[in-house]
Amino acid sequence: MTTSTMQQLKHDGDFSDELNETSTIQFYNKVSQQRKRRKTRTTFSNCQLNELENNFNRQRYLTPTDRDRIAKHLGLTNTQVITWFQNRRAKLKREAEELERDVMALRKQKQQKFTCLSLSDHDHEETQIDDENEQGDNNNDDDGDDNDVEEDDGEEQEKNHTKYLTQPPSISNILPSSLKHFPSSTLNTLEIDNKHETLNMNLFINPFSNEKCLKRNKDLIRQQCYLFNHHINNYCTVNNDNNINNNNNNNNRKNSIDGMNKGRSIKKGNKIWCPALELEQEIH
């Protein structure tokens, strides 16, 4: 290959590169011209925007007659009205999507809060169970202490029982509930009369034999009840005699008055109630 042919090929390659550069420059020039040919953005007045918004709220899509009417009323072209409605529908769609995303985000936040609260409640329940178990262990220890205390109480009760067996009860302790209104002076005299006898009887009681003590106390209780009833009967008979005398005097006085008024005598039954024995006796 000669030098002339090599130079020729080199010249052809340079020429092809120049052609490529010129073609790219022309392409960019065409694009820039097209950009320059774009129409300027139309500006709407406040009155036009308010009217377009009112029409959009009434109907999203316009019929040809409505489009012509709005264009004539606002002094706009049909294409301007169409583009405005298209842009407004696109804007409404974007707002709806954003609102839906916000709602989903709020729901996720609420779910996260709910899960956190449920986990905290579960942990709280576990801590309560642990506390209850600890309290149960403490209660078991306390039960052991209570058993010791109950044993001590049982020993004290046994001591009191032996003490009761060695000491006979007084008359005031064996007094029936129906005789609580009985005069206290009489009860005091009964206790004074029986004190000497009970003291003498206690001398023969053996505090170390429970059966003998119990039998002896029963005998003492019978004797005290007998003495107590004897004094009550004496007290009631005295009161009955006094009441009978008073009633006879009243009856005689009444019969004399009735005899003077009516010329005849009337016998009437009178009832006397003894508060100690709760008995009624009828006197004719």
Curated annotation (Swiss-Prot):
Protein name: Homeobox protein SMOX-5
Broad class of the protein's primary localization: nucleus
Upper lineage: Eukaryota, Metazoa, Spiralia, Lophotrochozoa, Platyhelminthes
InterPro entries: HD (IPR001356), Homeobox_CS (IPR017970), Homeobox_TF (IPR050848), Homeodomain-like_sf (IPR009057)
Chain residue ranges for the region called Disordered: 117-172
GO cellular component terms given for this protein: nucleus
Keyword terms of this UniProt record: DNA-binding, Homeobox, Nucleus
Regions of compositional bias (Acidic residues) in chain numbering: 128-156
CDD domains assigned to the protein according to its UniProt record, in alphabetical order: homeodomain (cd00086)
Keyword DNA-binding carried by entry: yes
Cellular compartment(s): Nucleus
Single GO MF descriptor: DNA binding
Pfam families tied to this protein: Homeodomain
Coiled coil ranges: none
DNA-binding stretch(es), residue numbering of this chain: 37-96
